[in-house]
């Protein structure tokens, strides 16, 4: 609802601007045309609350995603409308790629914009949330793909060597060297690559992914400062050990938790 309130506030300012530009010279029809503009909101995707793919085990997650949503037809203008969908976060991108985008594309939009209220989730959590494997994160997959695209895959090897070197350190001396994976790229470059990765083959609509940035997230919730899965700045030394170990597991194709 916050997004709709914000867009409506913008639209009211736009209406005011257009009316002022008329300098008092307007007809009733013209005024009505300006005032009648509104934001279209529809419940297009209806979620089955009994199904939750995020907490499903890896083996069964993929087969569940196709059964989570149903849609409403006859609302979207074919090859004209842009659909803006809001997600609280994008962790793996599994549901987007295997379910949501395929379903929404059948409605015929020209473009689908996915807006994540959370920043890019780049690092594992080790304080209670089930996000422990680097290779699962779509943001990490995007960064690795960008290294391959740009001929900088050697940096992945360098980060691995640094992780191995620190693995025997006392945890108080370990630093999060996995940050280097993301450093060469802007947030926009990673977001664009994520859009490529989550777009299923065969869909017609253009796909755009927009993430909340970390600075604005802190501005929105100043009393909640835990951001390590976005920033990599862990509040305890053990967090750095976990992220480096998670990268070692990824590099060695070891499919297990880092803690």
Where are these regions (language model features)?
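PRPP-associated nucleotide enzymes
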Residues: 1-259
């Amino acid at each position: 609802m916050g997004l709709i309130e914000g867009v409506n506030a913008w639209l009211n300012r736009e209406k005011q601007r257009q009316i002022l530009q008329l300098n008092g010279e307007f007809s009733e029809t013209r005024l009505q045309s300006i005032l009648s503009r509104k934001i279209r909101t529809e419940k297009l995707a209806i979620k089955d609350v009994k199904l939750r793919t995020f907490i499903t085990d890896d083996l069964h997650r993929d087969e569940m995603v196709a059964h989570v949503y149903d849609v409403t037809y006859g609302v979207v203008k074919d090859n004209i409308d842009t659909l803006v969908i809001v997600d609280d976060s994008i962790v793996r991108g599994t549901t987007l790629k295997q379910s949501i985008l395929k379903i929404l594309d059948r409605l015929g939009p020209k473009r689908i914009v996915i807006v994540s209220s959370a920043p890019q989730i780049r690092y594992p959590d080790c304080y209670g949330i089930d996000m422990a494997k680097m290779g699962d994160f779509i943001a990490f997959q995007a960064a690795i793909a960008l290294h391959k695209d740009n001929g900088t895959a050697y940096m992945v090897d360098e980060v691995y060597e640094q992780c191995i070197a620190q693995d025997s350190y006392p945890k108080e001396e370990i630093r999060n060297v996995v940050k280097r994976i993301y450093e060469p790229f802007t947030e926009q470059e990673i977001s664009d690559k994520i859009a490529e990765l989550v777009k299923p083959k065969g869909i017609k609509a253009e796909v755009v992914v927009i993430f909340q940035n970390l600075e604005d997230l802190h501005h929105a919730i100043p009393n909640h400062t835990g951001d390590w899965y976005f920033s990599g700045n862990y509040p305890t030394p053990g967090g750095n050990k976990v992220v480096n170990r998670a990268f070692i597991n990824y590099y060695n194709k070891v499919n297990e938790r880092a803690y």
